Amino acid sequence: MRIHHPLTLAALCVVLHESLGAAQHSNNVARLEHYRIAEIEHWEKRHLRSDSRGHRHHAHHGQVIDKENNNSQEQATTGNSVETNQVPSTEPTKDKTTPMKNALFKLFREKKLKTKNAGNGHAHDDDDDSDFSDDDVPTNAPTDAPTGAPTDAPTDAPTVAPTDAPTDAPTEAPTNAPTGTDAPTDAPTDAQVVPTFD
């Protein structure tokens, strides 16, 4: 008899346990799927049965209404009244989100056109764009338009202007001018005496 290592036996046990657990799990999933399918089929059959019953009920009331319309003269003369139930309206309900969807579609379209036409000065501003297509929108600007200033304009100022003042102007005053040192400096000392009367 061959003796296995304890770790080998433990590993085999783990593998067996995992495989059994996976098999059990798959079995449980299959069982749940079966139950869910059976429940869905049950509810679908019940719903179809109730729908067919309701259609027959409505058809019966429709026959009663037709009979009432055919015998309206008789009821007016005899005074008898027949109770009838009104058939619920089968008019399809209007989707309340349709205006919102249309508005969002219009906004996205305008934004797309503005982004597409940026730079060429053409945008579609009409409210009704049902007959508007992208084919009549220019996508490229004309390539022969002038884009820069003329290149033959003079760019430099004339360089022949005089930059220096004349150097032959007199810069010194004459040094032989009288300075006032030889003017008389003494005043007369024999001033006139004025006589006084007592």
From Swiss-Prot:
Q: Where is the composition biased (Acidic residues)?
A: 126-137
Is this entry keyworded Signal?
A: yes
Q: Where is the composition biased (Low complexity)?
A: 173-191
Q: What induces it?
A: Highly expressed in zoospores/cysts from S.parasitica and in the very early stages of infection on Oncorhynchus mykiss (rainbow trout) cells.
GO cellular component terms listed in the entry, alphabetical order:
extracellular region; host cell
Compositionally biased, Polar residues: which spans? Answer: 70-91
**Disulfide-bond pairs as recorded:** none
UniProt entry keywords in alphabetical sequence: Glycoprotein, Secreted, Signal, Virulence
Glycosylation site residues: 70
Q: Give the residue ranges for region: Disordered.
A: 48-101, 115-198
Superkingdom classification of source:
Eukaryota
Subcellular compartments? Secreted; Host cell
Motif location (RxLR)? 46-49
Subunit-structure text: Interacts with the effector Htp3 within the host cells.
Note on domains (UniProt)? Has a conserved RxLR motif that acts to carry the protein into the host cell cytoplasm. Lacks the 'so-called' EER motif, which is found closely behind the RxLR motif in most of RxLR effector family members, but the presence of an EER motif is not always essential for the translocation of every RxLR effector into host cells, or for inducing a hypersensitive response.
**Family designation:** Belongs to the RxLR effector family.
Task performed by this protein = Effector involved in the disease saprolegniosis in salmonids and other freshwater fish, resulting in considerable economic losses in aquaculture. Within the host fish cells, Htp1 is involved in the uptake of the S.parasitica effector Htp3 at a neutral pH (pH 7.5) and its release from vesicles into host cytosol where it degrades nucleic acids.
Could you identify this protein by its name? RxLR effector protein Htp1
Organism ancestry: Eukaryota, Sar, Stramenopiles, Oomycota, Saprolegniales
Gene name linked to the record: Htp1
